[in-house]
Amino acid sequence: MAPEEYVFPWPDESFDLTLAISLFTHLLPGALQHYLREIRRTLRPGGRIYSTFFLLDERGKAAVASGLTYPTFTAPIEHGLLHDPLVPEDGVAYEPDWICRIFEEAGLGVTRVYEGTWKTFAEGRSYQDVVVGVRW
């Protein structure tokens, strides 16, 4: 079954919180959009999503260009970059504006973004970027 066809096995409005840690860093755009819609469906109104990404903001782009990040992101795709084009789901980085847009299209709002250490090479709360959202 393609990821875009998977229906979460829970009823509508089942959860107050969804954790998607190191999930979206392995999903291609269509699957990512579908999973966000499924997350919205299974969250109660006001429910939260805590998710992680590799975000290609200015600092992320600079880190990738330095060649010092892991994963490396070298193969362009629509809205982002892949770590390995032969194994696309091995690692995916996305443009933050697109992530905010698809959250909104799925009926979720982004409430907070925390920068990950993958691009700062400093101490921090998470290796990957954290995106916190809410079901409106």
How does the language model describe each region?
Residues 23:
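Conserved sequence/active-site signature of Rossmann-fold short-chain dehydrogenase/reductase
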Residues 15-16:
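Local beta-strand N-terminus motif with an aromatic residue
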Residues 1-9, 29, 33-34, 48-136:
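Class I (Rossmann-like) S-adenosyl-L-methionine-dependent methyltransferase catalytic domain
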Residues 19:
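A conserved beta-strand element that flanks and buttresses the S-adenosyl-L-methionine
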Residues 33-45:
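A short glycine-rich, Lys/Arg-flanked "PGG" loop and its adjoining helix->strand segment in the class I
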